[in-house]
Structure formats: C-alpha cells, structure tokens
C-alpha cells in the first residue's frame, strides 16, 4: 500500500515511478522525444526593451531587473545514466573548490554546544563557524539555536536525518529563519548543508496562530543571493513558511516582465524531506540554474494562509525562476504536487524541466499557471513559457481541506505556452467521488501544448479524462498523440470551441461511456483512433462516427 509519509525514502522514487508506468522505456530516448515535441512550432515572446545597467550595480543595488527570454537549455546524462543539467559539471568543480577551502574541520561540541534539546547553543555555533572556510561537524543530539547565518566557504554537516537536529529556540520570533546565509545584499557563495534535521519549532506558537510573517521569512532554510550552494540529505520539520527556499533577497511584484535582482544561482538540493510546512515544501523565486533531485515533500499544515485557502505545494517553482530541473521527486497530500507559476504582478517561472515525479493524493498533481493572465480581458503573459515534463505520475488526486473550493486534477495548464509532456500516467480511485470534474485540463489561453504517451485509468466518477477548454478564454494549438484511456471517465477527450487541435493514436476503452473523442470544431489532423465502449465514439464538428471522419 502506498502511503508516502514523512519517512518515505526519496531514493526509491525512480523505481516507484517506473513500476507505476507499467511499461519500460529508455530515459535518454524519452528525453529526446520530449525535446522534439517541445521544438515543434515553439512560440517566443516579443522582446522586452532592455535598460543598460552595469552588472555590478544591478547585482548590489538595483531591486529589479528585466526578464530575458532564453531558449530551453539542454539536459545531459551523467555516468550513472541520471539526467542532469548541462551546467552540473561546473557545479561539481565548485564543490571541489569548496572542499579545498574547508579542510579545517571543527566540532560544535568543542565550542560548548550541548545537544540536550534545552541549552541555547547559538553562541557555540557562531564561534565554530567564525568567518567561514571551515567544515563544521554537528554530532548527534538536539541543538537549540536562535538562528544561524552561514558565511561563504562553509560546510555544515550533521550525522544524518533524525540523528542530528537543529531546532529553533522557543523564544525566537515568528519571522526567524532557522538557517540562512550571512550577507543578503553582498551575497554569499560556496555553502553546503547536509545530513541534518531542521526543526522550526512551530509548537512555540499558539495553535491557531498564522505561522509566518510574510516575504521569505519563517523558513527552515533560506538561500538568498547565494551562488554555488548544496543542501543534501536534510529534513525540514514544520516550518512556518517554507522548508527550503532558494530565492532573491526580496520577492518582487513590480510587474510581469521584471525579476528581482540578487537571486540565487547554481544550487543543488538532493535527498530532502519536508512536512508540516505552512506554505510550500521546496520553492524557488527569482533564481536560476537550480537542480532538485530525489526529494519528498508531504502533509503541509497550510498555516501560513487563511484556513481553507492554503496554496501549499510540495514543489513550487515560482515568480521569476528560470532554468530549473526537478528529477525523481515525490509529493503527497499537498495542494499542488508541482506548481510552476507566478503571481499576476510578477514574471512567470520559465524553462522548467520535470524528469520523474510521483504525485500521490495531491489536490492538483501538476499545476502550471500565471495568475491574472487567464481571461481575455487580462494582459497576455510576457513570460509564461517553456515547460517540459518526462516520466511523471499522478496517482489519485483528491479534494483537500487545504483549499476547500479546489477540485482535484491530475494536471492543469493555464496561460503557459510551449509545454511538452511525455510519458504521463494518471491513475484514479474507482471508489472515490470526483464529482464529474475533468482529470487533465488545458485552459485559460494556454498555447502550443503537446501531450504524448499519456494514459488514464480508473477515474470512473470524473467527468472527462482530457478536456481542452474552448470559448472566449480558449486554449489553442494543442497536439495529442499516443493517448490511452482504460475504463476511466465517461467522456474521453473533449475539445472545446475555437481550439486548433491535432489528434493521433488514441486508444480508448470504456463501459457505457458517453463519447470517446469530441471536438466542437474540425481538427487539423485525426488518425488512428481506436475507440470502443462509448455511446458516441467520435464526434467532430457535429458529425458522429465509429471511424475517422
């Protein structure tokens, strides 16, 4: 039985995803297929006028920089066959440099730290870390601190999750970050944190109290304006806001087309676990070149939001983020398993690649959107571009008390352009009431969407397996290929008015279904549709048939 609780080993995610697909494929070949899908008639945004500002001034003083569109970067395979960003070798070299600069090793116990869960060890940790260029060992135990700021060239290491816990002091203010970097304005570099449990100590707050104070405060670990960072084999427990936040110094809401300056870059997060988070598990803002691997986020509290309105995601690639890879991660019982998005007054995350993800009992397994750019009266998004996802699973999405008005979805694509999805398995629960909602929705002016090798089963109480919304806010330029529907919703594929679509290689089987494939308008191409068990197998532009029209 699948649970995916806080003790789930995220190193098992790759095997879990493979087993759930129920068929095997070569990941290198699959990634090439996804790239080809993405490159079919890719749309690029209009150029945004650039202001010439010296780099040093921009990094240190300017609060806002303009968004720059870049092509989707390449993914490589390492020696073990694991997908990695093209810049991973550069980060590995910087890790070697970090190791050379932190040969001096100290133990916090030698500076008076006591892991009894009572003693305030803030001063001992500060003395051990000093000005950096040191590897700091934290032994087994529970070490209370009032917060920790790490300088450049710092290597902080415990004895493992559950063995070494760093816990926030009971008198620490609600805004306090448990661990962060030293210099936000000037920036830091070469910081590594690993083999720890980080406990934000939410119990120090009143039970019904909102758990965060706004901005990027109240988290377990925050990297703000950090270049070259690593977080490995670390657990985050009950943070007020985020478990792990890779971010700029401040969030920026100066409008679509702008990004915050002083973001973080070249950060690798691996084997992380988080639960009880008030907002999101792992999140990025206005940062680039981020790699998130073999991590698991589950069971948020949602306490950073008003009850019933908690947009608490397992993995959130948020405002202004660019060039982010998520590889073999998992999420459970979150609002969104993976959300790629932006607020209405910020630039959307772009150039995001998901390669292996398992979503279990999330409300919306995969949610791609640019809020405030969905309706025809809204301005078109300048920045919501470029998402690729390969080998992903949505298992049994559910209604959630986190966001009570949100109905479950396996995937929702809104406002984004250039989205390619390949090898996507969606599995429902035949005994669960999905209240006739669609399982996968392409909507709200999403354009240039390609779905290939997508399978649905067991959503018997849903309304439609794959719905492309038409009307005034219609999606457009949608290509569907190799779609398999096995005794799932009563309506297989539903394409609304004003949508240009192409469909090929669909196999749909149902018992007493309503229709297998319906399109209000003629489709550009339709071929190899094997549909049975529906009252109306095929309906295109009002004409029905058991064969291709």
Please tell me what each predicted stretch does.
Residues 1-137, 144-145, 151-155, 161-220, ...:
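Extracellular "leader-to-stem" segments immediately downstream of a signal peptide or signal-anchor
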Residues 107, 130, 137, 143-144, ...:
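Extracellular beta-strand solenoid repeats
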Residues 145-149, 161, 167-169, 202-208, ...:
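Short glycine/acidic-rich loop motifs that flank beta-strands on beta-rich extracellular proteins
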Residues 159-162, 189-200, 227-240, 257-276, ...:
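Right-handed parallel beta-helix
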Residues 252-261, 374-381:
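Intrinsically disordered, low-complexity Ser/Thr- and acidic-rich flexible linkers and loops
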Residues 316, 345, 377-379, 409-413, ...:
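Tandem-repeat/low-complexity and Cys-motif detector
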